[in-house]
Design a protein with these regions (language model features):
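S-adenosyl-L-methionine
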Residues: 10-32, 46, 68-95
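Conserved SAM-binding loop of SAM-dependent methyltransferases across substrates and taxa
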Residues: 41-54
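Conserved SAM/SAH-binding beta-strand->alpha-helix loop
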Residues: 60-65
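Class I S-adenosyl-L-methionine
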Residues: 11-17, 91-92, 109-240
Length: 240
């Protein structure tokens, strides 16, 4: 049966996402209830709700100004059904309100703090979509050590930057190697993996160059450890 023509739909202004946010939106399970923590302009929940991809959304932010922008985005694209909350992390979100949690666009240490402050996220009933901007290796290690297991990891290139996105669940930690901690847990087969490894290696060499300028004798040990990690990443890159 052909679809009926709907003039109202044709006039609807559609939100378009940049590649990083598009990947995050694509990884959200259909029909679920989502909490977007640190929502900023609210682009991901608005995009998902506009297309009927999710049942409900909570958009939270620690800042009043970003939350105001998120409300304006929803109004601009005529999207309802999003609950906007001013709070730090998951402080104002109850476990029974959501099935999926998106935390993106912030440092890995901040994401770690948010999850540490909400231990209920580790019980296995929630899919966490995480996109750290910094300290990626620290977040991978913390997740592994704190009973979260990786179900998916993907890379996306946005404005000449490579970003990793993890999908994790609580319940049983995934033991990871140094190569996985620094280079990715589930990226074998990703077309961007070789470029990502090269980027990670270059950043480690930059850190080592800075450490070598210091007279602190402890830095010599740090440099040796980082050099060992670089060798492992280079070996991995050579297998791709």
């Amino acid at each position: 049966m052909p679809y009926a023509f709907c003039p109202a739909f044709m006039k609807m202004k559609e939100l378009l996402l940049q590649p990083r946010l598009q990947l995050l939106a694509d990884m959200v399970p259909a029909g679920s209830r989502l909490a977007d923590v640190g929502t900023d302009h609210g682009y991901v929940p608005v995009w998902l709700m506009q297309r009927g991809r999710i049942a409900a959304a909570i958009a939270s932010d620690i800042g009043a100004e970003p939350l105001r922008h998120a409300k304006e985005t929803a109004a601009e694209y005529k999207v309802s059904g999003i609950d906007f909350r001013l709070c730090a992390g998951l402080d104002a979100i109850e476990p029974e309100e959501v099935e999926n949690i998106l935390i993106a666009g912030m440092g890995g240490e901040t994401i770690q703090t948010i999850l540490s402050d909400a231990p209920w996220t580790a019980d296995g009933g929630y899919l966490l979509l995480l996109q750290p901007m910094t300290k990626v290796e620290l977040l991978r290690k913390w997740l592994s050590d704190n009973q979260y297991h990786f179900t998916e990891e993907r890379l996306v290139c946005d404005k000449n930057h490579l970003y990793p996105v993890f999908a994790v669940r609580g319940g049983a930690g995934t033991p990871i190697t140094l190569v996985q901690q620094y280079g990715g847990v589930m990226l074998d087969g990703d077309p961007l993996y070789a470029a990502y490894l090269e980027e990670r290696i270059a950043k480690l060499y930059k850190v080592m160059a800075g450490l070598k300028k210091s007279l602190d004798p402890e830095n010599a040990v740090k440099v040796k450890n980082l050099m060992d990690i670089c060798r492992l990443l280079e070996e991995k890159r050579g297998t791709l």
